[in-house]
Amino acid sequence: MNIISKIFMKKKFVLACAVLLLCATSFAQKANYALAERFSAKRVNQMVFSTQITPNWFRDSDKFWYSWRTPQGTSYYIVDPVKGTRTEVFDMDRLAMQVTEFVRYPFEAKHLPIRDLRLKDDKEFTFSIISGLNNDRDTTCFRYEIATARLDTVAREKDKYPRWASVAPNGEFGVFAKGSNLWVMDSTSLRKAAKDEKDSTIVEHRLTTDGIRQFGYGYGNYSGDTEADSTKRHYPGELVWSPDSKRFATMKWDVRKLDDLWVINSVSGKRPELETYKYQMPGEPGPKGYLYLFTMNGSRDGASFKEIKSQAFKDQEVSLQGARRTAKDNYLDYWKNEWLGDNTGFYMVRQSRDLKRLDLCRVDVDSDSTKTIISERERTYVEYRTPFLIGGGKQILHWSERNGWANIYLYNGDGTLVRNLTEGAFHVEDILGVNEKEGYILLSACGVNKDENPYQMHTFRVPLTGGALQQLDMNDMDVLSTASDDAKFFVANYSRVDWTPAVALFSATGKRIADLETADLSLLFEAGYKFPERFKVKAADGVTDLYGAMYKPYDFDSTKVYPICDYVYPGPQVEANNISWSKGFTRTDRLAQIGMIVITVGNRGGHPNRSKWYHNYGYGNLRDYGLEDQKYAIQQLGARHPFIDLDRVGIHGHSGGGFMSTAAILKYPDFFKAAVSCAGNHDNSIYNRWWSEQHHGVLEKIDKGDTTFVYSIQTNPEIASNLKGHLMLVHGDIDNNVHPANTIRVVNALIRANKRFDMLILPGQRHGFGDMNEYFFWRMADYYAEWLIGDSERWKPDITQMNND
């Protein structure tokens, strides 16, 4: 080799070493456990308090009261929308001193533990205070007159009606389930039972005798009475009353053909405990429902009842429609459960098992006839909202996606269409209120403003005579509104993922009456918090816009390169993508602090608040439909931002997101390098029938006059042999929603494919992981720190961050 060749080879070697050194430097990160520790759920709850208002409307006026907590304590206010005033209910310093004098235990304003605050007769508040320590604790009840600011002690009020009774609207008697049948008590016995269920003077009367185990009254269509229930009174499911309290309707479900499922709680006591419950899986025989109408003969004379013929489809779903609750209902001593309709009839919805056919029906209580008022038919599945009756029930406001978008239609009571009240390429979420006197409705909708994120909800007014939507609230925010009963005013909670939550009061004309509150995030910002960044990318089709949020480490350095982790939930009922601000950001903001970029982004087939095409994109392809969009979104962000390392990509999700994250690392094994998959429904053939059949589809086969249902779906175990990266599977061992068998089947497939993987079982935990969420977080942080960052405390036996919290 000549001298020139030697020099050339030496330069190539030096250049290669430099490249390797640069690559090693870019990957050599330190996981920032301390920053993630600073924003634990416990610590965030000590820094951030109220972020939204729940207005408690007065019974006989448009006033409302609310509470608001900050680092300075809790304040209580009464708002008069007509006058545009906000008045503080209590002088908290004075109240604390008064309470201290009464209970002989010291309190100060910032730490006054007011509980069970209730408004009575629009004139006074009652509340309770617990004072003392440990075994020397007392509860003292108070009455506070609003007009005079007078404070008195009062006897402690217990519930006047037991919670296991469905009380008639007039309060004179209540129906409950016991064993497999229905029973009734008058108000005198109900009040006695509220004080002491063992009172020997309580009188109860049996209404039915034909109920048997697994085919009884008072249970839902996916449950059934057990031996332990035979002597226990409980609230009767699916029972609605006529307004005059003379009748009620209820369902009786035959669930005897539903198979049992089991979980074993290994830590509940001395012996592991078997828990048995009914659980219908896709394609399995379904329950059969029977609708009954009861006519009360008085609490002492029982009731007469008859079956109402309602069957239209095999294994149909039946839902009895309830009337909307009003502010006055909240001041009753019992939960009012009135049917939608009047004294002459009520409404029910029946839907075919494949959910492609839905009928809104009215049942006439005198003729026992069932009439279909509105029918909906789809080739995927029909969704619906509870109808809104106006004109004394003569007209119906009906929500439908029949034109590919969710809109509101006005019908006459006989089922004839009057007009479309809304019509456009946007999504109406719900009717907030109706003012018939002035002829308008208030509704929440998104996607109307085409220059905004289409998920951002707004409040609109539309005339009952039809016309253009009038937006009443602020632009470029996600708004959650609550309207007064007469729909003259509404309280708007608004924020964005990158905007501090605030609350404003509006009139139905769009006048901004008052800015009520802004969340105090000062302590959070002092700790180093920074808002995430919103972004927009394209779906894999290159056409559909997808929206997301990017969470960076709070010590972000733009000159460094970071791994990226995608927090996912595929839908179809919701996406993981955050639109409004929330302090519950453990799996996004907090996870990023160990030293990663974390994103959330939608995908076709995800959120229902866009077009029906977008929402139903995954129909028939429930495993893979969102994966390509997630991958392409990450690739676009990597091309857009030089600080993102596309060679270190992670993915994480819970429930449907656990299913999706595992599918992603198996479907694209060269792209996703690490996945943490929690409580995933990895095999939807053993997940619950309703969700799986709705969102994937079920084939209805009719042969020789009988209808059967066939379900087939792709699963994660089928592609387990594709694993190349690092996968951690997590499940609670008594998850009775997504059964642990979903994860075990993936484990079985991985073992048989000779794959290494990690698994974490959380003992005694249900679907949400309960009190082991903090432990889970650090195990997840360890996993990504090891496989994406290259610096982990995974091998240390103690999680010191939990010991410090």
Feature roles, as predicted:
Residues 4-8, 12-14, 145, 162, ...:
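Residue-level detector of intrinsically disordered/flexible regions characterized by low predicted structural confidence
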Residues 1-31:
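Bacterial Sec-dependent N-terminal signal peptides
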Residues 28-501, 505-506, 793-794, 799-801:
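Beta-propeller folds
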Residues 20-22, 40, 644:
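Short intrinsically disordered, low-complexity segments
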Residues 19, 36, 218-220, 510, ...:
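Glycine-centered structural positions embedded in regular secondary structure
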Residues 55, 260, 334-335, 343, ...:
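Serine-hydrolase catalytic core recognition
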